[in-house]
């Protein structure tokens, strides 16, 4: 069936549509050659139409273990070519079969290069995937999409000797797995219930990734600041942005975001450059950072945006990139080790009211 990707400025791109005939969302692009299974199920992509830049997607199928959440989070997938005949010993579905199972539209044979050039030149915009480009209606994401992506109840993984509370704004499974692999017990706490950490009394806090505008979490910034002032904290992606906001900083939206597995980041402390996996639309405004409390630890090599912070007095650190990768390079996994070895030991006694 013929289908279209229609952008909010009226530009349309034709292709072949498989699945549900109509959906709307924010059109973004991912530049990685692999990792489509993790991308499709990453809660940070909640409500978005993902355009894959690599021309062939699905060649190794979909397996049962590399999901980042229990179901696809994207509104639709747009590719140049979807591979129907996958080749991998662990695969159980083709890309098309998996998306059909969840009624997620797949638009193929699209000139994805032209789509990306359009978004890159004009910025991220709302879009619809539809069987008819006439009269297409475009509805953007709700203001607080993290509310839809976070868990509804507290859960626990692992039984290690270090107890980490993972505050969930739409966390990736691989973040919890990375901590469990390092000997941690991980308790996932929905951000709406974050005050539960005072009863849990963990050794440390991790503020997770998540979708959408960090300012949509503004009503919780006071609680976030109180918690991270009492517990050693690591913020990842959205969690990093929330730490900056909690200490009086500001964030803004990039024209087309960082989404891929080859983003170079420099550590200002060691002068080392390493490749990172990233997925975000918003960044911290460097000019807004309170230099009396926070210092910039990492910068993006290409656009010099802020990629990580450290508190000057409290055991608090943050990164804009994804140290757990999945998908992407494992060069920054040491962030978890640094947090557990150097930040956690600085734990202060919880101040009881």
Curated annotation (Swiss-Prot):
SMART domains reported for this sequence: CPSase_sm_chain
Coiled-coil blocks: none
EC number: 6.3.5.5
Entry's Gene Ontology molecular function annotations: ATP binding; carbamoyl-phosphate synthase (glutamine-hydrolyzing) activity; glutaminase activity
PROSITE patterns linked to this entry: GATASE_TYPE_1
Pathway, per record: Amino-acid biosynthesis; L-arginine biosynthesis; carbamoyl phosphate from bicarbonate: step 1/1
Residue positions of the active site: 237, 322, 324
InterPro entries: Anth_synth/Amidotransfase, CarbamoylP_synth_ssu, CarbamoylP_synth_ssu_N, CarbP_synth_ssu_N_sf, Class_I_gatase-like, CPSase_GATase1, GATASE
Domain of life: Bacteria
Residues bound to L-glutamine: 44, 210, 212, 238, 241, 279, 282
Annotated Gene Ontology cellular component terms: carbamoyl-phosphate synthase complex; cytoplasm
Domain Glutamine amidotransferase type-1 stretches: 163-349
Annotated region described as CPSase, given as residue ranges: 1-162
Catalysis performed (reactions): hydrogencarbonate + L-glutamine + 2 ATP + H2O = carbamoyl phosphate + L-glutamate + 2 ADP + phosphate + 2 H(+)
Alphabetically ordered keywords of this record: Amino-acid biosynthesis, Arginine biosynthesis, ATP-binding, Glutamine amidotransferase, Ligase, Nucleotide-binding
GO biological process, one term: 'de novo' UMP biosynthetic process
Keyword hit for Amino-acid biosynthesis: yes
PANTHER family documented for this protein: CARBAMOYL-PHOSPHATE SYNTHASE SMALL CHAIN, MULTIFUNCTIONAL TRYPTOPHAN BIOSYNTHESIS PROTEIN-RELATED
Subunit structure: Composed of two chains; the small (or glutamine) chain promotes the hydrolysis of glutamine to ammonia, which is used by the large (or ammonia) chain to synthesize carbamoyl phosphate. Tetramer of heterodimers (alpha,beta)4.
Function of the protein: Small subunit of the glutamine-dependent carbamoyl phosphate synthetase (CPSase). CPSase catalyzes the formation of carbamoyl phosphate from the ammonia moiety of glutamine, carbonate, and phosphate donated by ATP, constituting the first step of the biosynthetic pathway leading to arginine and/or urea. The small subunit (glutamine amidotransferase) binds and cleaves glutamine to supply the large subunit with the substrate ammonia.
HAMAP family: CPSase_S_chain
Annotated NCBIfam families: CPSaseIIsmall, PRK12838.1
Family classification: Belongs to the CarA family.
Protein name per Swiss-Prot or TrEMBL: Carbamoyl phosphate synthase arginine-specific small chain
Organism encoding this protein: Bacillus subtilis (strain 168)
Gene name as annotated: carA
